[in-house]
From Swiss-Prot:
This is Elongation factor 1-alpha 1. Residues 70-74 are annotated as: G2. It comes from Homo sapiens. It is an enzyme of class 3 (hydrolase). Keywords: Acetylation, Cell membrane, Cytoplasm, Elongation factor, GTP-binding, Host-virus interaction, Hydrolase, Isopeptide bond, Membrane, Methylation, Nucleotide-binding, Nucleus, Phosphoprotein, Protein biosynthesis, Transcription, Transcription regulation, Ubl conjugation.
Length: 462
């Protein structure tokens, strides 16, 4: 078997008809976790429904439908392999909650794959149409997804087919606008593909002899290749933040007979070990971790990315809840935020937002109403330069620095210290109206909280 491949996460973005599903479906279909039987079943259904041209989007539609219905399908279906990596597609924007997911992200994407359609008139539509394409790329960048690959799709439907001129025109245009957002085009692989026919997906295409391959220049090592799969293989591997202090936002807290209280969540930074004394914020409860489990197996340590359950002593289910954050009591323990300063981008709000606006924030696993206490400055959303001091209101498209105050105790961190706890979605009217990253947190000095007997004992023993 040799060494296990590194796991990486990608997010696929682009306009609604750019062919994201077909392209993604193709990769999953050819390199992925879908077994022969499932594919044959899909093909048979497709034929019966007269969707003989089934190909790949159908695979994805089936998976999506199951995901939407809340059937937890085998997540391996959303995985595929390159020669170096196991790749998981953490989301594709067809989903209703795409933006929210991307922010409260069950996980951070290591790379975004932007699909643009080269077809006549299609590219223009995707880029202008209140530019979903721009919106997604801007979001990816704002939320810290610094690596980008661009797939110029549907090369088979250009005029004439596989037109070099059309491809070059698109590369030029896309380079210009990703540069405005903050990406450096030299570090981005551009690949002309057809997700439908398979051109340059896994094998170099015979239809584009003019394409001499993609090249990227970056300080961590240059790379070149021809296909989309090779470009994915050249993503720089993520550095998982094991050296930071522990932060583990709770997803749930269970009471398990014979064991006791078991909080469950994903380690975002740091390491969780049995015997550690942890503090939960904002409730300010400190206790000892008796054991740590993943998939019903005891672990000697849990690392960033691991979804774990851990048993804590002398803590009742009433003491801690979803949205609380666990950390090491001796190493920068998490604290309640009295307030925080954030940079927000208003995405779609029908009216005007002024000081006093109090929507719900989704930040890590917390879901809490927060007040826009003060609109400090309006800024250029790309460069971050100040445009105006103390604006009276904000509307769609604006970016601003805002002071926020949570309506109930909550624990958040600055994006630069703990990225997963420093980005949030602003929800109102059943949609994401804004996104933000936290610049600074005003932490509440914790009074004497509850320290359990086992924690006192563990601390004495040390």
């Amino acid at each position: 078997m040799g060494k296990e491949k590194t796991h990486i996460n990608i997010v696929v973005i682009g306009h609604v008809d750019s062919g994201k599903s077909t392209t993604t479906g193709h990769l999953i279909y050819k390199c992925g976790g879908i077994d022969k039987r499932t594919i044959e079943k899909f093909e048979k259904e497709a034929a019966e429904m007269g969707k003989g041209s089934f190909k790949y989007a159908w695979v994805l539609d089936k998976l999506k439908a199951e995901r939407e219905r809340g059937i937890t399908i085998d997540i391996s279906l959303w995985k595929f392999e390159t020669s170096k990596y196991y790749v998981t597609i953490i989301d594709a924007p067809g989903h209703r909650d795409f933006i929210k997911n991307m922010i409260t992200g069950t996980s951070q994407a290591d790379c975004a794959v932007l699909i643009v359609a080269a077809g006549v008139g299609e590219f223009e539509a995707g880029i202008s149409k209140n530019g979903q394409t721009r919106e997604h790329a801007l979001l990816a960048y704002t939320l810290g997804v610094k690596q980008l690959i661009v797939g110029v799709n549907k090369m088979d439907s250009t005029e004439p087919p596989y037109s070099q001129k059309r491809y070059e025109e698109i590369v030029k245009e896309v380079s210009t606008y990703i540069k405005k957002i903050g990406y450096n085009p030299d570090t981005v692989a551009f690949v002309p593909i057809s997700g439908w026919n398979g051109d340059n997906m896994l094998e170099p295409s015979a239809n584009m002899p003019w394409f001499k391959g993609w090249k990227v220049t970056r300080k961590d090592g240059n790379a070149s290749g021809t296909t989309l799969l090779e470009a994915l293989d050249c993503i720089l591997p993520p550095t998982r933040p094991t050296d930071k202090p522990l932060r583990l936002p709770l997803q749930d807290v269970y009471k398990i007979g014979g064991i006791g209280t078991v909080p469950v969540g994903r380690v975002e930074t740091g390491v969780l070990k049995p015997g550690m004394v942890v503090t939960f914020a904002p409730v300010n409860v400190t206790t000892e971790v008796k054991s740590v489990e993943m998939h019903h197996e005891a672990l000697s340590e849990a690392l960033p990315g691991d979804n774990v359950g851990f048993n804590v002593k002398n803590v009742s289910v009433k003491d801690v809840r979803r949205g609380n954050v666990a950390g090491d009591s001796k190493n920068d323990p998490p604290m309640e935020a009295a307030g925080f300063t954030a940079q927000v981008i208003i995405l779609n709000h029908p009216g005007q937002i002024s000081a006093g606006y109090a929507p719900v924030l989704d930040c890590h696993t917390a879901h809490i109403a927060c007040k826009f206490a003060e609109l400090k400055e309006k800024i250029d959303r790309r460069s971050g330069k100040k445009l105006e001091d103390g604006p009276k209101f904000l509307k769609s498209g604006d970016a601003a620095i805002v002071d926020m105050v949570p309506g109930k105790p909550m624990c958040v961190e600055s994006f630069s210290d703990y990225p997963p706890l420093g980005r949030f979605a602003v929800r109102d009217m059943r949609q994401t109206v804004a996104v933000g990253v936290i610049k600074a947190v005003d932490k509440k000095a914790a009074g004497a909280g509850k320290v359990t007997k086992s924690a006192q004992k563990a601390q004495k023993a040390k």
